[in-house]
């Protein structure tokens, strides 16, 4: 008996030591993680508790999609408001859309898109609605196809879902909120745009100003992904990218031009355990309000 207790004790210690090692390996977690692998999804195709959304433009869904995936045109998850072209639609409209796609309160929603920010914008929207069971498909459809997994052109039959929105206003940052909190040590403002846009040397797109919000540090969203793919960098690499720009425990607030690219950085911030918000109106809103901006490389 004493020997048996010793063996059990050693097994428990070994398991405890192995868990941090797995977390530090850079492998993305499955199950309840914000990021799931193609293998994780492949093992659950046909599971009625998992809804897969293919977010895109045009006819990309009809050309090829993951079996069972439902088509979600990107234009349906954004709306135009106050001269801003990419804002959150009303909650009732979003609920009706998602219920039509078969999403219920207990559904695990796995999302991929023609571009990574299409998927992450939908995940941000689901987060805003308070739907907790959400995941990004790491690698998206390109990785799925590279692994020779099945695709189809068939549209699945979808039973209507029943979704209860539980709005989380704390994941959204507006201009007034930002003006009240800029410069606070617990707020890390992250500009997810290109070098030219951040420096103020890029195209203004008709806006009255160019540059970045005061105090913002740049982390272009594409740096979060392996070059030319929809695959996120390993978790340790992502942590290093954020550690260079975000103090431990700070709330990450992301923005881009219209709240599209910023959603990718928002999602990764959450994946790494940071509290996060996204400025939905982003630079377009800030510039139209003629609020202060900075040019050059300094935050």
Predicted regions and their residues:
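Bacterial N-terminal signal peptides
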Residues: 7-19
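Boundary at the C-terminal end of the N-terminal hydrophobic targeting segment
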Residues: 21-26
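Active-site neighborhoods of enzymes that stabilize oxyanions during catalysis
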Residues: 27-37, 43, 78, 141-214, ...
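Mature N-terminal segment immediately following signal peptide/propeptide cleavage
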Residues: 30-58, 68-72
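Helix-loop module immediately N-terminal to the HCX5R catalytic loop
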Residues: 79-105, 221-251
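Thiolate-centered catalytic microenvironments shared by cysteine-dependent enzyme domains
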Residues: 86-181, 202, 211, 261-282
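C-terminal soluble interaction/assembly domains
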Residues: 240, 249-298
């Amino acid at each position: 008996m004493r020997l048996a207790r010793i063996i059990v004790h050693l097994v428990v210690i070994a398991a405890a030591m192995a868990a941090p090692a797995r977390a530090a390996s850079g492998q993305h977690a499955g199950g309840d993680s914000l990021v799931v692998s193609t293998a994780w999804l492949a093992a659950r195709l046909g599971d009625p508790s998992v809804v897969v959304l293919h977010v895109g433009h045009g006819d990309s869904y009809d050309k090829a999609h993951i079996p069972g995936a439902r088509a979600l045109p990107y234009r349906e998850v954004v709306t135009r408001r106050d001269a801003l072209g990419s804002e959150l639609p009303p909650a009732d409209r979003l609920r009706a859309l998602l219920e039509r796609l078969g999403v219920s309160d207990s559904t695990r929603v796995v999302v991929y898109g023609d571009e990574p920010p299409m998927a992450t914008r939908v995940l941000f929207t689901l987060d805003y609605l308070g739907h907790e069971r959400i995941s990004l498909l790491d690698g998206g459809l390109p990785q799925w196809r590279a692994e020779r997994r099945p695709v189809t052109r068939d549209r699945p039959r979808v039973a209507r879902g029943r979704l209860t929105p539980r709005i989380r206003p704390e994941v959204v940052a507006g201009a007034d909120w930002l003006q009240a909190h800029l410069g606070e040590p617990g707020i890390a403002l992250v500009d997810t745009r290109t070098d030219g846009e951040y420096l103020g040397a890029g195209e203004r797109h008709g806006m009255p100003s160019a540059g970045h919000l005061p105090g913002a540090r740049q982390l272009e969203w594409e740096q979060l992904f392996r070059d030319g793919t929809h695959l996120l960098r390993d978790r340790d690499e992502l942590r290093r990218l954020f550690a260079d720009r975000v103090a431990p425990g700070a709330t990450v607030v992301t923005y881009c031009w219209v709240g599209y690219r910023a959603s990718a950085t928002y999602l990764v911030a959450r994946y790494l355990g940071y509290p996060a918000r996204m400025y939905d109106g982003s630079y377009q809103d800030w510039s139209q309000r003629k609020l202060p901006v900075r040019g050059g490389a300094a935050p």
